[in-house]
């Protein structure tokens, strides 16, 4: 077995490959944030070279790197997650180094978890996520009553919000923007800072069309694994990246990756001035159920005031783009109109 660690940095990704003794077998590689297709192609080449040598390739990320799993697994790669309790302390900004991830997996394969497309980066930790969300109900409700948390708008108005997470991500973000333009429908995009500067054309297009641009962290981490300082840095750097492109103050609306939260995390977000954006309609489009299934799920779940969660990033989003016209036409036929999250009626 060969092990390829993938780390994220301020500028992109780094890759390091070792054998089952933890010894390097390939030169380290650095890939810019905007070149995820090239990163995927490089990994497929590594896999093929490994197989030619009679070995499989295990690709390893940590729990602060949530942007790659869908695309890499869809491409046929075997992806694993190393958790904080198996790793050394992270640097001030970035994940654990790629070589460390690879060596950790090589020396003790039992410490890493094989990821599944159905549960993504949180494979094996979904129960933990759900327990933390349940524990946060009182804190979430307190923020909602203070106007600092929104999962849906008023149930008295047939107005809904389309939202898209994890972009920008060419070509899928562009395809989704094309559909929104065709129907003249506003939306809210929760962008990941690591890719925002790399794909500034899509970000500029969102702003020019009047869509809302909001914060979805820098690297899509599982928030309970972050320190207060790490969380603040993730948000601040993403705000700055968006502001650099669209020429405005960075967003204050924030959606936690996976909806992950604890009472402590929510208090940190409140102290930092963020308004937490959740949702009440989820078609699980990231699991690639098919365009028809995505459309049907959204139409069945939507109520007045609904916030609909979809994805333009994090992998192949052709199904989401294909489903979107049917979603919009179906909701229009049911008497709904559309608003950005910051313009959704709340009373």
Short names for language-model regions:
Residues 61-64, 166, 312:
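Structural motif
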């Amino acid at each position: 077995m060969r092990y390829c660690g993938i780390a994220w940095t301020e500028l992109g990704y780094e890759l390091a490959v070792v054998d089952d003794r933890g010894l390097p077998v390939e030169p380290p590689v650095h890939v810019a944030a905007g070149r995820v297709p090239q990163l995927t192609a490089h990994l497929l080449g590594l896999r093929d070279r490994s197989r030619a040598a009679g070995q499989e390739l295990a690709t390893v990320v940590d729990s602060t790197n949530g942007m790659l799993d869908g695309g890499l697994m869809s491409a046929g790669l075997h992806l694993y997650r190393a958790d904080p309790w198996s790793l050394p302390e992270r640097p001030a900004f970035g994940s654990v180094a790629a070589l460390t991830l690879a060596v950790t997996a090589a020396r003790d394969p039992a410490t890493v978890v094989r990821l599944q497309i159905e549960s993504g980066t949180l494979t094996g930790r979904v129960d933990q996520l759900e327990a933390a969300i349940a524990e946060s109900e009182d804190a979430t409700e307190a923020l909602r009553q203070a106007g600092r948390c929104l999962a849906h708008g008023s149930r008295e108005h047939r107005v809904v919000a389309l939202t898209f997470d994890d972009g920008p991500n060419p070509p899928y973000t562009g395809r989704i923007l094309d559909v929104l333009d065709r129907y003249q429908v506003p939306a809210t995009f929760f962008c990941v800072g690591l890719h925002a500067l790399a794909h500034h054309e899509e970000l500029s297009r969102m702003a020019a069309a009047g869509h809302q641009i909001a914060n979805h962290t820098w690297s899509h981490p599982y928030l309970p694994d972050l320190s207060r300082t790490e969380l603040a840095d993730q948000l601040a750097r993403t705000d700055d990246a968006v502001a650099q492109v669209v020429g405005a103050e960075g967003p204050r609306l924030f959606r936690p990756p996976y909806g992950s939260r604890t009472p402590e995390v929510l208090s940190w977000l409140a102290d930092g001035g963020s308004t937490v954006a959740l949702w009440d309609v989820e078609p699980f489009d990231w699991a690639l159920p098919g365009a028809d299934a995505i459309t049907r799920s959204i139409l069945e779940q939507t109520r007045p005031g609904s916030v609909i969660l979809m994805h333009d990033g994090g992998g192949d989003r052709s199904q989401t783009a294909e489903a979107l016209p049917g979603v919009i036409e179906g909701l229009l036929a049911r008497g709904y109109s559309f608003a950005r999250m910051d313009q959704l009626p709340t009373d």
